[in-house]
Design a protein with these regions (language model features):
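Double-stranded beta-helix
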Residues: 108-147
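Conserved short histidine dyad/triad with adjacent acidic residue
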Residues: 41-64
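Short beta-strand His + acidic residue motifs that chelate non-heme Fe in jelly-roll/DSBH
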Residues: 51, 79-80, 101-102, 107-112, ...
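A short, N-terminal "cap"/entry segment at the start of jelly-roll beta-barrel domains
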Residues: 1-44, 92, 145-147
Length: 147
C-alpha cells in the first residue's frame, strides 16, 4: 500500500492498494473521516460474517468532494494522480487486483491491455459531468493535443 501526499498541503490525496498486500487479517485502508471507505481481507473457504443491516446516518457533504476508487479486475492501466494544484504527483502501472483510491486531487488512466476490466466506485449522487468534474488543463493531455 502507498499513500500519495500533496506537495501543496501535505494531505493524503490518493492511496494505491496492491493485490499483493492483502493479508488474512482485515486491513482498513482509508481513514474513517472519509466518505469513501475501503477495506481488504484475505478470506478462507466457508468463512462468513453475521448477517446485518447498516444504520442510517447523516453525512455532511459541504466539506468534501466526490471520492472515487478503481479496482482492476483484469488487465492493466497506467494511473496518473494529480496534486490539488493540477501538477502530476504520480504515474503508476496498476494490475489485476490493484486499487486506486482518490480522496482529493485529480486523476486519469490509460488502458494498457485489450479487454481490461475496471470497476469504478464513487460517492454519489452523480449529477452529470457539468456538476461533477473540473477538467485539468495539462499540456501532456492527449485530449487537448487532438483538438
Amino acid at each position: 500500500m502507498r499513500n500519495i501526499i500533496s506537495k501543496v498541503n501535505g494531505s493524503i490525496l490518493h492511496t494505491i492498494f496492491y493485490a499483493k498486500d492483502v493479508s488474512k487479517k482485515r486491513i482498513d485502508v482509508i481513514a474513517e473521516k472519509n466518505i469513501l471507505q475501503f477495506s481488504a481481507s484475505g478470506l478462507k473457504n466457508k468463512q462468513s460474517f453475521r448477517p446485518h443491516f447498516h444504520i442510517p446516518k447523516k453525512i455532511d457533504y459541504t466539506e468534501t468532494t466526490s471520492q472515487e476508487a478503481w479496482v482492476i479486475i483484469k488487465g492493466s492501466i497506467k494511473a496518473t494522480h494529480y496534486d490539488v494544484d493540477s501538477k502530476i504527483l504520480n504515474e503508476e502501472i496498476l494490475n489485476e487486483g490493484d486499487v486506486s483510491i482518490t480522496l482529493l486531487g485529480g486523476h486519469t488512466f490509460e488502458v494498457l491491455e485489450e479487454d481490461t476490466i475496471l470497476y469504478e466506485f464513487k460517492t454519489g449522487p452523480y449529477l452529470g459531468v457539468k456538476l461533477d468534474k473540473v477538467f485539468i488543463k495539462d499540456e501532456t493531455d492527449p485530449y487537448l493535443q487532438t483538438k
